[in-house]
Amino acid sequence: VIIPPKGGHGFNAVQELGAFFVMTNTSLEGTESANSGDVSVANDFRKVCLIKDPKSGGSAANAATLRATKAIRLTGISGTFAVDEKITQSSTGAVGKVVEFDSTNSILYYVQTRHNDEGVDSNGNQTAFSGANVVTGTGGAQGTPETSHSATTNNVVFVSGYSVPEIDHDSGDVLYVENRAPITRAADQTEN
């Protein structure tokens, strides 16, 4: 005869199992295009994080995947923007770094950092890319933001040619961080 604990087995799993740790496992499959295309194969990655309660637009984020990059829909493109290339908008003083360039949809995905105080105003605030001002890469590529484009393209929502990240920066609690050697992705690749 097995005598269950008060409330039955599974009533209080933490107490019954004596658990203090949780193990998780996930797989990154190709570009995840069946979901949203948020997992790019255009760039390598070195860090995997688990974030508790991230926000999206000030509310709880509930999507399966979220893109943390900003994006610009370009027109009149000359040249090709390269991954990790510095981009600038001289008329505004904005500076960024290319994460991915989707030449099919004319979308430039980028991030802005404060590591070297480039692209910040006198108060230390980042200067945003804005308007129909030409964006130039250090390799010579150029494009003009398509400010008349306010639509969803490739699962990215644009307003006047610009898209904000789907996750609010500095939101949520970092529960786990794993630093890895650089992993270069491919469309037919799965990481565990």
Regions found by a protein language model. Give the residues of each.
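Interface-prone segments of viral and bacterial extracellular assemblies
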Residues: V1-N192
